[in-house]
Amino acid sequence: MSKLHIKKGDTVMVISGEDKGHSGRVLEVLVKEQRAIVEGLNMIKKHAKPSAKNPQGGIISKEAPIHISNLNVVDPKTGKATRIGRRLNENGKLVRYAKKSGEEIK
């Protein structure tokens, strides 16, 4: 399995599918499934029974995972979707950078 280009906390843009063009912050990365949960995107409705946690019950909206092939990291310099590369910085540490601008992604 190859290394994933997306990490928790990244701002990503959807490049394909129903939410194409929308962006959000990554809440969780599901490595084995190669999917990510992005804040406010790919919303699904779940019917919940009343419980101690949710005494009212009803229909709840929540984020569903999106396959990482449909996501690109947003370039911090330009604000547009970009591919990610890896290179050694001046300290000899491997860092991610935006291919479009060359800006390091933290």
Swiss-Prot record:
Annotated transmembrane regions: none
Keyword tags: Ribonucleoprotein, Ribosomal protein, RNA-binding, rRNA-binding
GO cellular component, one term: ribosome
Keyword RNA-binding: yes
Gene3D superfamilies: 2.30.30.30
UniProt-listed CDD domains: KOW_RPL26
GO molecular function: rRNA binding; structural constituent of ribosome
Similarity annotation: Belongs to the universal ribosomal protein uL24 family.
Protein role: One of two assembly initiator proteins, it binds directly to the 5'-end of the 23S rRNA, where it nucleates assembly of the 50S subunit.
Subunit and interaction comment: Part of the 50S ribosomal subunit.
This protein's name: Large ribosomal subunit protein uL24
Protein source organism: Porphyromonas gingivalis (strain ATCC BAA-308 / W83)
Gene for this chain: rplX
